């Protein structure tokens, strides 16, 4: 359905004092993306015609974040309640001929599908003025209550502070999220007063005003997790945990095996293929694609990387941005790859740093190999050819190219290109002195005894 255009109006004017942070509350991340970013992504998926954020304290941070996202900004100063906050969008949206969706920047998990249900209900045959998103929490706490009939029609909405004992016994609570016909919203807001316990202008009052005019408002219900809000670090952690729990379930439903799901942490954009096995304590940062049949062993950290079909990562491996691990390749324990490409079947099994490098198919990188890619000012690239073998404890000083099939002897420091199928050995000549160690020990014993 959702035929009429809609504008998303996101409220983000709160001071967020309980977060005790210099970062604006709505910019704190869930799964690596700011909370506000999750909401913008959701309404973008539904094709929002306009997007507007109402902010107050710390607005410069919010403005900087939304500037490249096609989002307009309005300011609420001072903060006089939710109805007053929505009113700050009138100047931008007064001529908008569509519906207005009201969201909260600190309620980041509401799915696009739930938003669609709200907008579709607003276009129902009974033509409601407003659709309110309600939920039934395990503990209603101090949420506002929705007084609704069996068909979802709302008789009244009341803030907890102003509710009677009987009203507080109702378990249908107001999430604050609402969809309103734009042609009615501003007129209704103009009639909202502040004769209540807090002296604020409450958005839910428009439901009562519309009903007095003969208009109808209805409730659509959501699961409690969808409308969980964040006002403290503890609540931020709880919302993160819920997001991760659901993402893990989705990964397993799509054909991945998570040995200990509760220990795997995804980013908002992690892509995981089928028949992937992820062992305990794996962390995915942003920008990761894991193709089919990959094994990621425990305690590995992957960000900004692509791992191709059948590759094996870890344990204790780190893939940094720009890492591209080829089909059937192996990145082993305590190996770090940054901006490095590994060809099909290439291996770096132990204790290596491979940065700004191209590693050819079937190449074998020995333990302790370091690509020396930085001189303190600029980065340089290392190219290792197909089938090359790099001996243990080697340093490859970039820019340098190791040809196809070449062998670098263990312990070498390579500063010049090595041609294909050549052997390069770059280390000091070994010297052995017969009996020297025994003579040294005896001399040192005498010296030590003389000091007593």
UniProtKB/Swiss-Prot annotation:
Q: Where is this region: Pyrophosphorylase?
A: 1-233
Which CDD domains did the record assign?
GT2_GlmU_N_bac (cd02540), LbH_GlmU_C (cd03353)
A GO cellular component entry from the record: cytoplasm
What enzyme class is recorded for this protein? transferase
Positions annotated to bind Mg(2+): 106, 231
In residue numbers, the region (Linker) covers 234-254
Which positions does UniProt annotate for acetyl-CoA binding?
Answer: 367, 373-374, 392, 410, 427
The entry marks the following residues as binding UDP-N-acetyl-alpha-D-glucosamine, namely 11-14, 25, 76, 81-82, 104-106, 144, 159, 174, 231, 320, 338, 353, 364
**Please, one GO biological process term?**
cell morphogenesis
- InterPro entries associated with the record: Bifunctional_GlmU, GlmU-like, GlmU_C_LbH, Hexapep, Hexapep_transf_CS, MobA-like_NTP_Trfase, Nucleotide-diphossugar_trans, Trimer_LpxA-like_sf
Q: Which UniProt keywords apply?
A: Acyltransferase, Cell shape, Cell wall biogenesis/degradation, Cytoplasm, Magnesium, Metal-binding, Multifunctional enzyme, Nucleotidyltransferase, Peptidoglycan synthesis, Repeat, Transferase
Question: What is the required cofactor set for this protein?
Answer: Mg(2+)
What subcellular compartments does it reside in?
Answer: Cytoplasm
Q: In which pathway does it act?
A: Nucleotide-sugar biosynthesis; UDP-N-acetyl-alpha-D-glucosamine biosynthesis; N-acetyl-alpha-D-glucosamine 1-phosphate from alpha-D-glucosamine 6-phosphate (route II): step 2/2; Nucleotide-sugar biosynthesis; UDP-N-acetyl-alpha-D-glucosamine biosynthesis; UDP-N-acetyl-alpha-D-glucosamine from N-acetyl-alpha-D-glucosamine 1-phosphate: step 1/1; Bacterial outer membrane biogenesis; LPS lipid A biosynthesis
Q: Which residues form a coiled coil?
A: none
Name the Enzyme Commission number(s) assigned to this protein.
2.7.7.23, 2.3.1.157
Query: Reaction(s) catalyzed by this protein?
Result: alpha-D-glucosamine 1-phosphate + acetyl-CoA = N-acetyl-alpha-D-glucosamine 1-phosphate + CoA + H(+); N-acetyl-alpha-D-glucosamine 1-phosphate + UTP + H(+) = UDP-N-acetyl-alpha-D-glucosamine + diphosphate
- Any one GO MF annotation of this record: UDP-N-acetylglucosamine diphosphorylase activity
Q: Which residues does the Swiss-Prot or TrEMBL record annotate as the active site?
A: 350 (proton acceptor)
Q: What detail does the entry give on cofactor binding?
A: Binds 1 Mg(2+) ion per subunit.
Protein task: Catalyzes the last two sequential reactions in the de novo biosynthetic pathway for UDP-N-acetylglucosamine (UDP-GlcNAc). The C-terminal domain catalyzes the transfer of acetyl group from acetyl coenzyme A to glucosamine-1-phosphate (GlcN-1-P) to produce N-acetylglucosamine-1-phosphate (GlcNAc-1-P), which is converted into UDP-GlcNAc by the transfer of uridine 5-monophosphate (from uridine 5-triphosphate), a reaction catalyzed by the N-terminal domain.
HAMAP family annotated for this entry?
GlmU
Oligomeric and partner information: Homotrimer.
The family classification in the record reads: In the N-terminal section; belongs to the N-acetylglucosamine-1-phosphate uridyltransferase family. In the C-terminal section; belongs to the transferase hexapeptide repeat family.
UniProt-recorded name of the protein: Bifunctional protein GlmU
Q: Which organism is it from?
A: Rhizorhabdus wittichii (strain DSM 6014 / CCUG 31198 / JCM 15750 / NBRC 105917 / EY 4224 / RW1) (Sphingomonas wittichii)
